[in-house]
Regions:
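Alpha-helical substrate-recognition element adjacent to the catalytic core
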Residues: 2-137
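A general, composition-driven signal for non-globular sequence regions
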Residues: 1-2, 156
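C-terminal cap/substrate-recognition subdomain and adjoining C-terminal extension
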Residues: 93-107, 114-244
């Protein structure tokens, strides 16, 4: 496996890793190497989904409005969709990272602006039934698919308000955010520390805003960081991981 053969850049984590903390982990592009929702749309949706995507990119639609219009365009039957999800890999080191968290009693929650059905299918296929999932709810009916937003909040453009979820999940502890994209940027403001996938929008946002963060290539990097001695006092390292 590539992750176990690559020389790791070990970076220090802040002091709170020895205290009570909770891990909030994104899914699409974080737990998986690519955005699963976009891959499903690309493969199975009417081509007009791209026009809706462009409207979102231009700022004319919120992320929630965008997904609400795109998901009904998916034409795959449930069995075909399941077969597609069976082929979706997880990012190198994620399975090992979940085992590490479980062995240390570290609360790990998947909080995603994607589809709960796809997330659970992929996690369950890898034997990870125990991980809590907070995501938009995919509804299947005779007429097709639609999305519900049980974790949305008025005034939040996302389907899942990650800030609201984190305030509950990590109410009595520090919040460690692991993510990659735009849906993670708001939570990065209040998270105690952020692990941002190298070269993605979350990394750029944290750097521009001066939020405490470090980059990673895969979950083997994160595992190495957790196992490394915590420096005293903590200081943000200047080193950046190599480009992908």
């Amino acid at each position: 496996m590539q992750g176990s053969q690559t020389k790791r850049t070990v970076f220090p984590l802040p002091e709170f890793v020895e205290e009570s903390y909770a891990v909030i982990c994104d899914f699409d592009g974080t737990v998986t190497p690519f955005d699963v929702t976009d891959a499903i749309l690309e493969r199975f949706a009417h081509p007009s989904w791209k026009t809706i995507e462009d409207e979102w990119v231009q700022g004319n639609l919120s992320a929630r409005e965008c997904m609400e219009r795109q998901i009904p365009l998916i034409g795959a039957k449930p069995g075909v969709l399941e077969a597609f999800l069976d082929e979706v890999p997880v990012t190198d080191g994620f399975v090992e990272f979940t085992r590490f968290c479980r062995s240390r009693d570290i609360p790990l929650t998947i909080v995603s602006d994607g589809m709960d059905y796809a997330i659970r299918h992929i996690l369950y296929r890898h034997g990870m039934h125990h991980i809590p999932v907070v995501a938009n709810r995919l509804i299947r009916s005779r007429t097709g698919y639609q999305l519900e937003f049980p974790y949305g909040r008025e005034g939040c453009p996302s389907g899942v308000c990650k800030c609201s979820v984190a305030s509950i999940v990590a109410a009595d502890s520090k919040c460690l955010l692991i993510g990659d994209g735009l849906s993670d940027c708001c939570l990065a403001r209040s998270a105690s520390f952020t692990l941002a996938r190298h070269g993605k929008s979350l990394q750029r946002h944290c750097a521009e805003q001066g939020f405490p963060h470090q980059t990673y290539l895969d979950f083997f990097d994160i595992l190495e960081a957790f196992k490394a001695p915590v420096p005293q006092p903590y200081a943000m390292p200047a080193a950046v991981l190599p480009a992908v």
